[in-house]
């Protein structure tokens, strides 16, 4: 194996490993989107009511998004989190202080919630199903797993190529990484589109701002890494095969 191809193969493996770590981290963390709002007063009946609704199994899209807006919420692919006062005194509000302890509480999306239909008017089950938002939501959490699966399968083929001391099978690895990159890019695009459509339905309060978090950024970085790894795998395998064929033809001649 030529040193050029071996170097390209090693670099592609490193890029693939980094992108896999980034993708896995983005799936497992809860900072795809973050809301920033004024810290709420400790101990109020409204706080308790919102928290109870937030953790309820029957919480609809509007209910938990209202809580996310109000309590500096963060959203991942599988969990939603809010920041609430650490010690809640439901019986009477304590005197206001400049600051008080807060704690982050998270609730996981159930598999049923992940596949649940989204409505044209969030929270209103009589408003009809919003098919676009429904399928965007489903794609945004399914595609990252497809991406990881493709990369793992590609890594297995690459391992077989190393055992066989041949670069040619890595063409399949490159193609799988290309498909993984497309899945990651599709997931990111679906998430952005879904957030924009949601905010058109549920406008943010004046005192609340929202931004994409670092988990989302990891997914965004993972996609180009997958594309670069794919290009290197395919180039190394194709060029090495081509040179081997030419050399074989030269020897025969």
Curated annotation (Swiss-Prot):
Location in or out of the cell: Cell junction, Tight junction; Cell membrane
Transmembrane regions: 5-25, 141-161, 175-195, 216-236
Pfam families: Claudin_2
Membrane topology: Multi-pass membrane protein
Keyword Transmembrane helix: yes
Glycosylation sites: 42, 72
Function statement: Plays a role in negatively regulating the permeability of cells to small molecules.
Comment on protein domains: The C-terminal region is required for localization to tight junctions which occurs in a TJP1/ZO1-independent manner.
Family indicated by similarity: Belongs to the PMP-22/EMP/MP20 family.
Protein's name in the database: Claudin domain-containing protein 1
The organism of origin for this protein: Macaca fascicularis
